[in-house]
Amino acid sequence: MFKFTGEDKGQLKCSFCGKYQDQVKRLVAGPGVYICDECIELCNEIIEEELSEEVDFELKDVPKPAEIKAILDQYVIGQERAKRTLAVAVYNHYKRINLGSKLDDVELQKSNILMLGPTGSGKTLLAQTLARILNVPFAIADATSLTEAGYVGEDVENILLKLIQAADYDIEKAERGIVYIDEVDKIARKSENPSITRDVSGEGVQQALLKILEGTIASVPPQGGRKHPHQEFIQINTTNILFICGGAFDGIDKIIANRVGRSGLGFGADIRSKQEQNVGELLKQIMPEDLLKFGLIPEFIGRLPIVVTLDALDEDALVRILREPKNALVKQYQKLLQLDNIELEFEEEAVRAIAKEALRRNTGARGLRAIIEDIMTDVMYEVPSRTDVTKCVITKDVVLKKQEPILVTTNDAKSRRTKKEESA
């Protein structure tokens, strides 16, 4: 007696495992292919297993707050409170992302960060270093170039394009990145009261940023620029992107001082002059109402729940910045001359003089490079051509009086050696 196979019966079969229709419970049809219920179940198991492995790896991969701060200490001098707050905020943010793939009754909300501090206090450096620690895509955007949709300038979606480019167009990777929006204080509305005229580069930009800060699926033009109807867009979910907004917020210390002064009136008030309370102390007392008075809209403030304040850098901090970090400027210039077999030495008084000049210019740590570059340009121009120079010494007079640095040559070394031999 003959036994008919599925093929003889003209039955359909699974394109993956080859089983016929009568050998499985269900066969799902696609364009020219079929898949059985057993293969579907196996695919689901493989995907779930891979996802759980990926999540477990990420949980182990995120450094603890103390580890994040320890690495920040290697690059950023001072700002202890700011580094602690940022370390905790970033750690919690990535814990929240990892929890998101698991079913849980507690939903953790997104916590974007607002950084306030004088120019050159380390806002951008902190954000860059965080991205390097976590090995995630990082993009810097300038809020002053943004305008409301439909006006000349950049759309807010162009910020996300920079992040996508930093992730080499890997959307999944970009969706876990960090975006630093600089000069966010420049998009404050021009007056405290709502305006009847359109403020396209101030309040309008704040309104446009609300959705991407909170979390939305944004349509990003792949080539940047303005959107137009006959264009394909890149879809990116901003729910798990950490936004750090930074700004100097010049003048907000006066707003805080006025509020603190009003609350301190009457008998038993702690009377302190403005000179006694420096800007750093005042910024630590910042409240949402101060940001509102400065010109940020309530919805924008609400989407930046973590406020980090940075102190102005003093002379000692600037001296440490010049010498201590891994990428310290003194170390960088020493390395540059070392490549020409020349030893570079900065005397302690010279380093102090550079720090004082940066304070005088009121440029913070950012101004240090300009001062050193001015000192070193002639040296770096002349010295590589001379084979007799072995050492270059930068003194206080080189910084303050624009004198020539001390160049130690092989002849000097020989004469010193001869004198030692003669005295012996």
From Swiss-Prot:
SUPFAM superfamilies: Glucocorticoid receptor-like (DNA-binding domain), P-loop containing nucleoside triphosphate hydrolases. Keywords: ATP-binding, Chaperone, Metal-binding, Nucleotide-binding, Zinc. Pfam families: AAA_2, ClpB_D2-small, zf-C4_ClpX. ATP binds at P118, T119, G120, S121, G122, K123, T124, L125. Residues 2-55 form the ClpX-type ZB domain. InterPro entries: AAA+_ATPase, ATP-dep_Clp_protease_ClpX, ATPase_AAA_core, Clp_ATPase_C, Clp_protease_ATP-bd_su_ClpX, ClpX_bact, P-loop_NTPase, Znf_CppX_C4. Disulfide bonds: none annotated. One of its GO terms (cellular component) is HslUV protease complex. One of its GO terms (biological process) is cell division. Zn(2+) binds at C14, C17, C36, C39. GO terms for molecular function: ATP binding; ATP hydrolysis activity; ATP-dependent protein folding chaperone; protein dimerization activity; unfolded protein binding; zinc ion binding. ATP-dependent specificity component of the Clp protease. It directs the protease to specific substrates. Can perform chaperone functions in the absence of ClpP. PANTHER family: ATP-DEPENDENT CLP PROTEASE ATP-BINDING SUBUNIT CLPX-LIKE, MITOCHONDRIAL (PTHR48102:SF7), ATP-DEPENDENT CLP PROTEASE ATP-BINDING SUBUNIT CLPX-LIKE, MITOCHONDRIAL-RELATED (PTHR48102). HAMAP family: ClpX (MF_00175). Belongs to the ClpX chaperone family. Component of the ClpX-ClpP complex. Forms a hexameric ring that, in the presence of ATP, binds to fourteen ClpP subunits assembled into a disk-like structure with a central cavity, resembling the structure of eukaryotic proteasomes. This is ATP-dependent Clp protease ATP-binding subunit ClpX. It comes from Symbiobacterium thermophilum (strain DSM 24528 / JCM 14929 / IAM 14863 / T).
